[in-house]
Amino acid sequence: MSKFKSLLLLFGTLILLSGCSNIEVFNAKGPVASSQKFLIIYSIIFMLVIVAVVLSMFAIFIFKYSYKKNSESGKMHHNSLIETIWFVVPILIVIALAIPTVKTLYDYEKPPEKDKDPLVVYAVSAGYKWFFAYPDQHIETVNTLTIPKDRPVVFKLQSMDTMTSFWIPQLGGQKYAMTGMTMNWTLTADQLGTFRGRNSNFNGEGFSRQTFKVHSVSQNDFDKWVKEAKGKKTLSQDTFDKQLLPSTSNKELTFSGTHMAFVDPAADPEYIFYAYKRYNFEQKDPNFTAEEDLYKDVKDKPIKPARKVHITNPNYERHGMKPMILGNNEKYDNEFKKEEDHNSKEMEKISKGAKDENASKLHKKEHDDHGGGH
């Protein structure tokens, strides 16, 4: 068998094997995912029809108008009909793709129906983990999410460090979580089961392991789970701060109480840096630091007091939730500013030293070029 045939056979086998995989996007378990599945299939079929028509016309023109002996070359003339077709048809294609896409996208942003009481969950990304706070149930989980079937879930997406993207392929598309703000995303599971969720936006060496499990259960089972979760260890500020340290272990944890008792990440984006200092954690480049040295200075217990905050909105309004207003910790802010000023001065010294060194080298070179002054 020739090398070309072998490669062709291998390529064909790979294409056939790809059909054996379970593509989560096409295995929809919620209304949003079902709408997106329809859009994807609609767009693929629509574009395949266009490709088929174009290739067919291409083949016809090649054979019908190919060069023949003694044939005369045609002359180009103005043709209003053809010009109208090649301007109007692309516009109609864009409209046919845009209308269902825009309509579906706007439907995603609609709030839950009034007769359906939504479950509110704060999904917070930090340290290659996902924290899920249930403010009404007063529980919190890490890297695992439990939701009731057929009940809308209003996710309040936040990030405490890098920009990430919250994505549960079988329930709906991704949406970004960013520092200093809260993004809303409503999803519903219409089937029971366990689904996979992940961060779909690259954010560092732990990106591939920033995943979580989603358990869709009946309302009765959800109520039982909430009751059991309330009996777990209470989430203290010390415990939460330590959980903020970057880790790719992907452990699943459950606590009673939530971090929202002492911080709203959207209103206090610098909180995580103070948490690092409490446990003497210093961010290092993993490409130039041995794994055992990344956390060798981290303390088991905090070496600084917890950051004091004052919550003025503890009830978390359920629709259009306003962020909590946090009072600044003057002592911490002053320390942080002093450190920033110190680092800025150090950088200026280094920059000045580098400029002086370059000037000295240039002066020496000019001196040598002129024969050392002789």
UniProtKB/Swiss-Prot annotation:
For this protein, the record's Pfam families field holds: COX2_TM
Alphabetically sorted, this entry's keywords are: Cell membrane, Electron transport, Lipoprotein, Membrane, Oxidoreductase, Palmitate, Respiratory chain, Signal, Transmembrane, Transmembrane helix, Transport
Topological type in the membrane:
Multi-pass membrane protein
Q: Does the keyword Nuclease apply?
A: no
Where would you find this protein in the cell? Cell membrane
Q: Which residues cross the membrane?
A: 43-63, 82-102
CDD domains (UniProt xref): CuRO_UO_II
Gene Ontology MF terms in the entry: copper ion binding; cytochrome bo3 ubiquinol oxidase activity; cytochrome-c oxidase activity; oxidoreductase activity, acting on diphenols and related substances as donors, oxygen as acceptor
Full protein name = Probable quinol oxidase subunit 2
Organism source for this protein?
Staphylococcus epidermidis (strain ATCC 35984 / DSM 28319 / BCRC 17069 / CCUG 31568 / BM 3577 / RP62A)
- As recorded in Swiss-Prot or TrEMBL, the protein's gene is named qoxA
